[in-house]
Curated annotation (Swiss-Prot):
The keyword Cytoplasm does not apply. GTP binds at residues 62-65. Pfam families: PapZ_C (PF22740), RapZ-like_N (PF03668). ATP binds at residues 11-18. GO terms for molecular function: ATP binding; GTP binding. Displays ATPase and GTPase activities. Belongs to the RapZ-like family. It comes from Syntrophotalea carbinolica (strain DSM 2380 / NBRC 103641 / GraBd1). Keywords: ATP-binding, GTP-binding, Nucleotide-binding. This is Nucleotide-binding protein Pcar_1935. SUPFAM superfamilies: P-loop containing nucleoside triphosphate hydrolases. Coiled coil: none annotated. Disulfide bonds: none annotated.
Length: 288
């Protein structure tokens, strides 16, 4: 039987699974939506002998599979024992964003009940917690546009045409709003002087030249960047060697508007290379 590369797309309803499935389908994956997990081993056998057989398969699994979720560990073990390469992409978003998306689309939550959408989301998190713990990648779509999410998924799976380079996301965030899920490296830059307490700089962000000059001009910041760049010079090739295709570097300060933004922007361009695709995201820069 032909061995498949299998990507299981799972996660919270409204977190971007449909966008991810469409992106993989456009990249040549054979995509199946809402396949009961218990049928996965048999499906892979049938697919291997079919006229549409290909080596790349993606399956969307979520709470619509509720009756079949309990045996996921046994099913995954069976699939892997057959020689298939399995990655689990878990899509998530903060509750406030999920609630807003449901309000905007007016769609019914799969676990919809009289207690409301918030309670349905809570129950969904509980049901999918075990699968999340086993996931290969956790993708937080809270602050990503559909286009950004699609690009991220494609980079994770395919890299680009230059020998599948390492796709790096450098993102800033505010500890006030929580550490981004799916972060591989997290750096806390709250040890640096805060532009928030400089009246002229407070209304600006780390994207402005004044704030960037203030933050990057600090001796402590220059030393930090020098040490961190040396660490990345060691880590990035090591991640590539181990077969990692996507790396998320998260830089945090108190509110995610000044220090972390300035440093993330600097790093985004400092670590550019022919064997990497580097993108940037400022999760909390627009928040007050």
């Amino acid at each position: 039987m032909k061995r498949a590369r299998l990507i299981i797309i799972t996660g919270l309803s409204g977190s971007g699974k449909t966008t991810a499935a469409r992106a993989l389908e456009d990249e040549g994956f054979f995509v199946v939506d809402n396949l009961p997990l218990v049928l996965l081993p048999e499906f892979l056998k049938l697919h291997a002998g079919s006229a549409v057989a290909g080596s790349n398969v993606a399956v969307v699994v979520d709470v619509r599979n509720k009756p079949y979720l309990e045996g996921y560990k046994q099913t995954l073990a069976e699939v892997r024992s057959a020689g298939h390469v399995v990655d689990i992409f878990f899509f998530d978003a903060v509750d406030d964003v999920l609630l807003r998306r449901y309000s905007e689309t007016r769609r019914r939550h799969p676990l919809s009940q009289k207690e409301g959408v918030a309670e349905s989301i809570r129950q969904e998190r509980a049901l999918l917690g075990g699968i999340m713990d086993l996931s290969t990648e956790i993708i937080d779509s809270s602050w990503l546009t559909p286009h950004q999410l699609r690009a991220r998924v494609v980079h994770m799976v395919c890299g680009d045409d230059k020998g599948n380079p390492l796709a790096v996301l450098v993102q800033s965030f505010g500890y006030r709003y929580g550490i981004p899920q799916g972060s591989d490296l997290v750096m806390d830059v709250r040890f640096l002087p805060n532009p928030h307490f400089v009246p002229d700089l407070r209304p600006q962000t780390g994207l402005s030249q004044g704030v960037r000059d203030f933050v990057l001009g600090q001796p402590a910041c220059r030393e930090f960047l020098d040490r961190f760049n040396h660490l990345l010079d060691y880590l990035l090739p090591s991640y590539r060697k181990e077969g990692k295709s996507y790396l998320t570097i998260s830089i945090g300060c108190t509110g995610g508007r000044h220090r972390s933004v300035a440093i993330a922007e600097h790093l985004r361009y400092a670590i550019q290379g022919e064997d990497m695709v580097v993108d940037g995201l400022h999760r909390d820069v627009a928040k007050e």
